[in-house]
Amino acid sequence: MKLSTDAHSEIEGDAAHGNVLCNSASDSLTATDEVAAGNDESVATEGDDVEIPRDTNNSTPVRLLDKPGQNPVQNGAQPAAEESELESQRQTPVQKQQQQRVSMVNRKRDLINLQSALSPKYIGYANANSPTPLSDSDDTIRTTRRRVNQAAALNNSSAGETLAHDNASPRTPGGGGGGGGDDSANQLLSKTYMSPIEKLLIKNGASSPNSTGFEAGSEDLGIRPIVRKHVKRKMKRVPKAKVTLELDEKNQQEVDEKSVKTEPIDEEVDRTDEAPTQEAQTTAISIKSETEAEHKAAVDVHIKQEDTIRLDIVNNPVESTSIVITEEPKDLEKSTEELAFALPLASSTEVDLKSPPDLSSTALATSIKSPSSVSIDSAKGLSIVTDPGWPTYQVGDLFWGKVFSYCFWPCMVCPDPLGQIVGNMPSHPQRSSLDNANVPIQVHVRFFADNGRRNWIKPENLLTFAGLKAFDDMREELRIKHGPKSAKYRQMVPKRTKVVIWRQAIEEAQAMTQIPYSDRLEKFYQTYENVVTLNRQKRKRTKYMMQDTSDVGSSLYDSTDNLHNKQGTQLLAVKRERSESPFSPAFSPVKSKNEKRAKRRKLSNGTEADTGSNSMAVTPSQTETTVDSSAYENPEFRQLLSAVMEYVMMNRSDEKVEKVLLSVVSNIWSLKQIQLRELERDLASGEIEEPLGSSVVGRGSGVGTIKRLSNRLMTMMVRRSMTPVVTPSTTPAPSEPDRRLSEPPKTKKPVNRPIEEVIEDILQLDSKYLFRGLSREPICKYCYQAGSDLVRCSRTCSSWLHADCLERKVTGAPMPKIGSRKALVIPPTSKSPSPDEDHVTADAKEVVAVGTSLVCHECNVGEPEGCVICHQVESPAVPSTPRKEDSSSHTPIEDKLLTCSQPMCGKRFHTSCCKYWPQASSSKHSARCPRHVCHTCVSDDPSGKFQQLGSSKLAKCVRCPATYHQLSKCIPAGTQMLNTTNIICPRHNIAKADAHVNVLWCYICVKGGELVCCETCPIAVHAHCRNIPIKTNESYICEECESGRLPLYGEIVWAKFNNFRWWPAIILPPTEVPSNILKKAHGENDFVVRFFGTHDHGWISRRRVYLYIEGDTGDGHKTKSQLFRNYTTGVEEASRFLPIIKARRQEQDMERQSGNKLHPPPYVKIKTNKAVPPLRFSQNLEDLSTCNCLPVDEHPCGPEAGCLNRMLFNECNPEYCKAGSLCENRMFEQRKSPRLEVVYMNERGFGLVNREPIAVGDFVIEYVGEVINHAEFQRRMEQKQRDRDENYYFLGVEKDFIIDAGPKGNLARFMNHSCEPNCETQKWTVNCIHRVGIFAIKDIPVNSELTFNYLWDDLMNNSKKACFCGAKRCSGEIGGKLKDDAVKAHAKLKQMRRAKASAVRIHVKPKKTPKVKHISADDEPMDAKDE
């Protein structure tokens, strides 16, 4: 006899019941080693050996289980009462106490069952699932099986026997033939006293008088094996009994003859009307082994005579249970493994428990699997719950379910892959020890709007779904009761990133409530079948690039098969069609990926075949049509495919069309290769001349050919996109993955990469990585989103808008969030990629409106366009945009809206609003809004630079005038990219927690005190350090933010993350952010930084960072912690990488400047000075002087002629000069100047360069501009100080004769200052009017910068401007004293001597002598005067 390892046997006292597995295939009786395990425990408890009775007729052991009607125990066995007395005599005092404890527990349970007898739900349901609560003394006995096992350890008392008899299986072998068994049973009943309570328990369905309602169920008997290692450790160690069973072939054959064959699984067990006192007839259980591993695990066990166990099987009058069993098909597991969303099969497990139970002789005992407390649902809408304490769960029930850290999510009760909806799901299925861990009851659900994800949820984590309003009421109650920060309230609030999906799930669940229960499951699967289909269409093109395209491309383009057609028989591989029956193992509610409508096409040999997924023709022509790996690896082929795909698809995604294009492009590629081979062959044969043929082959095989084709297709596509839209398009808005089909798959960035590798990758990024893949479509002026249903306003504004957004604007409803809007998707009726159009005739029932026009809200109400900065018509008077200080006389002019003079703009702005936007120009003659210059490129001189657009376009913020180049190096970090021309800059969407984060020291002097904090960044300064008047009621914007210089991607910054100190970090571009960091919740305009010295990353906003500059060392607070060591390492790394990044950025700036030439701001070009009232020019001809130069001189009135007018700096008047037209002293009037050009000189700004040599004393150019008096000069200086404009063009001639070349002038206004200039200014009198000319003071070679000394004394209120002339004697300040080279050399030599002497001599500190202050060189000290 073989003992297997998968059965279960338990021995309690003298009664033994177990499950023996009979393998009908091998005809061998198998049992489990649990029999041995149970016997070992019994022996360990008793401490004595018990002999197994042997048959007197032969020496073979007695079989444990036999046919019904046969009793392996002889009729002469001693009765149960005598056996009980013998057992009680062998009991120890400890065992008696345990027996008394068990009896007390049983009595308490019977009393509780008696109290529950009055409930009609209890009658007929006294079984293993009855809701009998445990007593305090039995709190450690969790399950039925453990209670039976513990009772087996205490089976030495009569009460233990009674408990064992009560818990015995109704299939315990009865007496043989019915005679002896009846006598034994009647004798036992006659000796047992039954109280009225016990009779009432029997009447209400208890299985025995002492029934506890916790008898072992069928699952406890045959399904889950139990290993008793944990129990053995708690028992007393005694020598184990050696169990051996030996069956010869004769006995084995006899057992096979007497065993009962198992009936079909679907057969119901019949019940008979026999009395409950009759003997129970049992049938051997035959269960087919599922795996061959169980046969291999079977071992032979023999029973030796010296160590035998005595098994006394007593005939008990046991009550049976009527069981109706319906098993699921055997192939259920296979079908559920293959299908993701398989419909539940029409099978169930129903357990009907009735009292009093009977079993007929023909009934079969079959072990069933059911949960210990709640039965398995049938997966057809039935939910059979035997426990009235548990709720009823039905397929299609809607709940709010909570798993892990997610909030409560709408879900629906669905069957799991095994067909269960309720069951025990142990947290540790591999655990085999018998500890006291509780196994929870869980319900299987699937979640809405979550791609059909499923999970098992505990009932306490389920809430009944009654709509969103009821959920909000419940959540509000929890908030009032526990507070908004409590865990109970937070688990009912979804995260910000999940709100949209959460509301979508609520909508789906709400729609499911309108569907009957019988159709909910099918509807659920249909919904997510569409989701799976859409996800399949969004796969990357590289996944199906190498797939066969014969089913689509070849069927539509049969003529292309003749390119590589070969003779021969064509094979047809036909696949078996998938069954459409929902009960079939191969059924799937989700259509197969290759399942399409079969098409009829003719093969080349004239036969017809079906092509498609079900029957696919594999032909040589189709095989060669498919793109092979060699062709796809060719870059020319990839470029050709990308160009054609972009031209045809137009940012759409259609798997069918793309497969067709792949087939067509492959055929075009094959044709081109054939033509190239023919050209090469003709060239080799000499039919074509070699120079011509080589050039043709070279041009045809180069990548430039594909590039030219791509440019032409791109031009055609742009022209087509610029055509006016008559009707809204029905194509859906492309999603982000669809637009990036041409991109290579992104590689996941690991978190713990070295910082050197990260910075190297950042420096290698191109200038367009932020704009790659963005849409070029316009966006709505209200919701800032693109879409296929955009319509242009029919009025003058010509803005784009959605119809529903216009309705929201009119009604005041909130606009949809960016990214949440879905395009209108109208399913096409044809398979062509072009949208369908309805054919309208005169007899059509409905009139189709063509060209529906919309008018935006502002145009409709006649509201004038407001300021581009404050978005208001009248100038605001708020602290964020204060008025100018001098507002007494010029308030009406400054409050007026100025219109931008740039072409194709027309934006209007207030002069007062330009205070924080220095990129704008508020000049009356040339007003310019801040949206025409890149704020990053002109940040060092916002008001003095103006960059011509050229080929570099601009991306503009939709909420403010911020404008940047369409280059990744110019876009600030955290910018929200809407499309290629519209962005949302980081100034917006600032969280409340980041609104007031500033440093505690002055950014200029690095000291504390009373600070003025910037409103847009963490910088704080002292008011006296900034040297500007700041009112208490107005906000302060620092110079960095005002100039538009925001932190960029790849720059090093100081970052304040949570409560940590300011830490050096680098801003990571979006392409370098690790994938796990991307999944973290963050704000709309946040960006990721990596902290130096660590591998930590974090999302952070603009308000928590400021630029790291050279020389920063951090705070000096030193500790010995690991955090401080990481901080020190981070500061060192930041200081080491800062010059590398700055050098790389300077190289990029030089490359950009070489491509896009910078130009100064526009100005009015004039030739002569213009007087500004009240100043006027007056000519007095009496003051004219004449010279003595004659026309016969070599150079009349020249520099060497000794002309009197030239020596007096007067220009000769042609009417009075004797030289006439030959006079050379007419530079100003004739404007004789060399060829000059304005060039950008980096940190020096714009400068003037000569393009031809200039000799010493030559006239260069006249300095012209507006001539103003001193009062006007003071007013303009104050205006420049308010505007923070440090570009001065004033040249003072006299007190009331000052030339201002700022608004009007010529090229002389671009000449820079130099401490060692090559030109100088001279005041000349021309026709009795003072004019200023610039003359060379040295020979100037070609391409040299022309400079002169500004001679500023006190122009900027005792403040000096830095000088960048680079001269040897440069003072460092404009207008400062020059440094003497000799003095500097002498000081350096003296310092070297002192250093050398200090090495050999010891210095003694000299006594301090009082210093005498000399007022002048002629003054003497006071001591000398006294003497």
Curated annotation (Swiss-Prot):
Biased composition range(s): Low complexity:
89-100, 723-733
Q: Which residues form the AWS domain?
A: 1182-1232
Give the top-level enzyme category: transferase
Kindly list the places in or outside the cell where this protein is found, as annotated in its UniProt entry: Nucleus; Chromosome
User: Bias regions of kind Basic residues — which residues?
Assistant: 594-603
The EC number(s) attached to this protein equal: 2.1.1.357
Q: Which InterPro entries match?
A: AWS_dom, PHDvar_NSD, Post-SET_dom, PWWP_dom, SET2_Histone-Lys_MeTrsfase, SET_dom, SET_dom_sf, Zinc_finger_PHD-type_CS
Q: Phosphothreonine-modified residues are where?
A: 607, 723
Q: Which GO terms describe its molecular function?
A: chromatin DNA binding; histone H3K36 dimethyltransferase activity; histone H3K36 methyltransferase activity; histone methyltransferase activity; transcription coactivator activity; zinc ion binding
Give start and end of each Post-SET domain: 1359-1375
User: Which spans does this entry mark as compositional bias, Basic and acidic residues?
Assistant: 1-15, 249-264, 736-746
Residues that the record marks as modified (Phosphoserine) are 157-158, 169, 433, 579, 581, 588, 604, 721, 834
- Main localization is nucleus
Domain SET span(s) in chain numbering: 1234-1351
The record's keywords, sorted A to Z, are: Chromatin regulator, Chromosome, Metal-binding, Methyltransferase, Nucleus, Phosphoprotein, Repeat, S-adenosyl-L-methionine, Transferase, Zinc, Zinc-finger
**One of this protein's GO BP terms?**
dosage compensation by hypoactivation of X chromosome
Composition-biased stretches, type Polar residues, lie in 21-31, 604-630
Xref: Pfam families: AWS (PF17907), PHDvar_NSD (PF23004), PWWP (PF00855), SET (PF00856)
Region Disordered, as annotated, extends over 1-103, 153-187, 249-280, 573-630, 722-752, 1406-1427
- Bias class Gly residues marks the residues at 173-182
Residue ranges covered by zinc fingers (PHD-type)? 777-862, 864-932, 999-1044
Q: Which CDD domains match?
A: PHD2_NSD (cd15565), PHD3_NSD (cd15566), PHD4_NSD (cd15567), PWWP_NSD_rpt1 (cd20144), PWWP_NSD_rpt2 (cd05838), SET_NSD (cd19173)
PANTHER family xrefs: SET DOMAIN PROTEINS
What does the UniProt function comment say about this protein? Probable histone methyltransferase. Histone methylation gives specific tags for epigenetic transcriptional activation or repression.
| Name used for this protein in its record | Nuclear receptor binding SET domain protein
